[in-house]
Amino acid sequence: MPRGPNIVISFKDIASDEEIRQSLELGCRQLAEEFPETTRFELTLAPDGAGHTAHAHVTGRNTEVAAHTEAIELGAAAVRLLDTLERLLRKVHDKHIFKNRRRAAQLTPKKRRR
């Protein structure tokens, strides 16, 4: 039975918020289901002046993605981070899939019209 991804969530210079931690962990697990090549999620939430920043690094088989978001509210920064990660992971995933299709299409001779 395959294990789930390794998820590390850090709250830097702020108190840990269990509700946000649980929503981030759930979001990471859903992303790992959709993108099975991912093996590790590292997320860091920190205050930044008047708002909050969220950083993430996702690694896995042929996958390395980094993301950064900002928002006034900590929860909003966390939600934006998950949305950004999904978009970036989809981009990397599609590149891996369509790269092979493009290569196969280039190697296949085109049919001539008669």
Regions found by a protein language model. Give the residues of each.
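N-terminal, polar/charged subdomain of small-to-medium soluble alpha/beta proteins
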Residues: 1-114
